[in-house]
A protein has these predicted regions:
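Membrane-interfacial, low-structure loops and terminal tails that flank and connect transmembrane helices
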Residues: 2-16, 66-79, 228-241, 282-290, ...
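Alpha-helical transmembrane segments of multi-pass inner-membrane proteins
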Residues: 2-36, 50-60, 87-94, 130-154, ...
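Short, hydrophobic transmembrane alpha-helix segments
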Residues: 34-47, 66-69
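Loop-to-helix transition at the N-terminal end of transmembrane alpha-helices
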Residues: 41-57, 338
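Transmembrane alpha-helix boundary signature
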Residues: 61-75, 94-109, 120
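Extracytoplasmic loop-helix module adjacent to an early transmembrane segment
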Residues: 106-119, 318-337
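Juxtamembrane membrane-water interface segments that cap and precede transmembrane helices
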Residues: 115-128, 190-204, 321-325, 356-374
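TM-adjacent membrane-interface loops and short helices in multi-pass inner/ER membrane proteins
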Residues: 325-364, 371, 378-383
Length: 485
């Protein structure tokens, strides 16, 4: 943090101790993380309804923050509305789309046929049913709560306390997944399962686990490198560094057990990149007595992980015909309604009208590509809103800060998940959605707190001279001419 060495001990306590809003956000974030990590069904009404209830605490947290924050925060509400604008826009698009439903019925004699009705492509549409409300409001609640991580924390020590707990939670879920694979279980412990074997831990689809593990693998290794940079850090063997490194490798190596080939390949390649960064950091920046052996071990593990990722890419069935047909159907839907798309969760309902004949009788919820499904459901308008938001925040960081290492390492995980979204459906999972925006907003907030004074990060610079139009007394600014009597 800028000029932190010149801060008095009393001011450091004021900065680093939690305010009531920070305490509330800390607890709510951990509760939401526990729920999405352990309740694996991505469309569970219990999960989505609980997330919606927890998300309703967002205005309470912000209002508490406004009343109890010790510094100037006149940018609080402008930041909130800017950060959450995409969520409100998508929710508004969904509500407007309810006025025109593209699905209808045609009755011929005693037969009833489902048809796609003509619609106005210049207005949003929606083919959703009543259950869609819970889904979209649940995801909006997740987004609103995670966005407060970019607004409420006033010190980097907040993230130094919450990130280890979040990393531990993710690693523990991965440990349970390893146990299940080792025991050869056909369904997660204490659940009825889905009937399929492509699960990991409590994630019913292991492609979702691969995206989740990618994010927290980067977070674990990023925390390792951060702890190693502190001047008062212990020798590596005696510090928490080995635990972070073990957790990151545990999460990354799970890619070898994931059946979804392309997501597992991205996970393994991301682990390779993070281990290579660790190798370079220990060789160039560390003064640890074991730095050479640590760098050598990390380098060898990076090579093995890289080789595993390449093998997964070129394995059979990495690009199956069914996935190709599903993506083609999504692209055809997009071409038929390119401006606003067909509405949230409409892909599965319209798929019978656009799918290949080889998929007749098979039920699919997703298009095997979040990007194509997003275009089919939200159109060009939605793509511009979401991508524009991400690009604007990334450009702001790159133009203003750029060299903050923890932020860079966390954003590597976010970028890897966006790559997975090109060929799989990670954002269908509430756990991945929550983890992505949690890490994204933490990374950006860390950058802001690292390069700004604590009393200026959320405030305009104070104007010590009041404008003439706002003064309550007359202002004389003309040249004084003395008159002799």
């Amino acid at each position: 943090m800028a000029k932190s060495d010149h801060i008095l001990p009393r001011d450091k306590l004021l900065r680093d101790n939690f305010t009531p809003a920070e305490t509330l956000l800390f607890g709510v974030t951990l509760i939401m993380a526990s729920m999405v990590n352990w309740i694996g069904d991505p469309r569970s009404f219990w999960l989505l309804g609980s997330l919606l209830i927890i998300g309703c605490l967002t205005p309470v947290i912000l209002k508490t923050h406004e009343q109890t924050h010790p510094f100037f925060i006149d940018l609080l509400w402008p930041k909130f509305w800017v950060c959450t604008a995409p969520a409100w826009i998508f929710l508004l698009q969904f509500i407007i789309g309810l006025i025109q439903n593209p699905l209808g019925t045609l009755i011929l004699g005693e037969s009833i046929f489902n048809i796609v009705q003509p619609i106005n492509i210049w207005l949003p549409s929606s083919a959703s049913d009543s259950s869609t409300w819970v889904t979209i409001l649940g995801f909006v609640a997740i987004y609103l709560l995670t966005s407060t991580l970019y607004i409420v924390p006033k010190s980097r020590s907040y993230f130094e306390r919450i990130l280890p707990l979040l990393c531990f939670g993710a690693v523990f879920v991965g440990f349970i997944g390893y146990i299940q694979k080792g025991l050869g279980l056909t369904k997660p412990i204490f659940t009825n399962g889905t009937g399929a074997n492509d699960f990991f831990a409590y994630f019913p689809y292991d492609g979702h686990w691969a995206a989740f593990a990618t994010l927290w693998c980067c977070a674990c290794i990023a925390m390792l490198l951060l702890s190693n940079r502190y001047d008062d850090s212990l020798p590596f063997i005696q510090s928490v560094g080995p635990w972070y490194l073990t957790g990151g490798i545990l999460l990354g190596a799970s890619g070898m057990l994931v059946e979804a080939l392309l997501p597992s390949a991205v996970l393994l390649l991301t682990l390779s990149v993070m281990l290579l960064i660790t190798t370079v950091d220990f060789l160039t920046n560390s003064k640890d007595i074991h730095r050479k052996s640590i760098a050598l071990s990390s380098g060898l593990a990076a090579c093995l992980s890289f080789a595993g990722g390449i093998v997964r890419i070129f394995q059979d069935d990495a690009f199956s015909s069914n996935m190709f047909y599903l993506r083609s159907a999504a692209f055809d839907m997009f071409k038929a309604n390119p401006i606003f798309g067909w509405g949230f969760d409409s892909y599965s309902k319209l798929l019978p009208f656009y799918s290949n004949d080889l998929l007749v009788g098979q039920k699919y919820e997703r298009a095997s590509s979040d990007l194509l499904q997003f275009l089919a459901e939200f159109g060009i308008f939605g793509a511009l809103i979401s991508l524009g938001f991400l690009i604007a925040f990334i450009l702001r960081y790159l133009l203003r800060f750029r060299n903050i290492r923890l932020t860079n390492h966390l954003l590597i995980g976010c970028g890897s998940v966006l790559l997975i979204a090109l060929c799989d459906v990670p954002f269908m999972s509430p756990a991945v959605f929550f983890s992505f925006f949690t890490i994204f907003f933490i990374a950006l907030r860390w950058a802001d707190l690292s390069r700004n004074k604590i009393d200026e990060v959320d405030a305009h610079r104070p104007h010590l001279i009041t404008a003439e139009t706002k003064r309550r007394v007359p202002l004389f600014n003309k040249q004084y001419e003395e008159e002799e009597k």
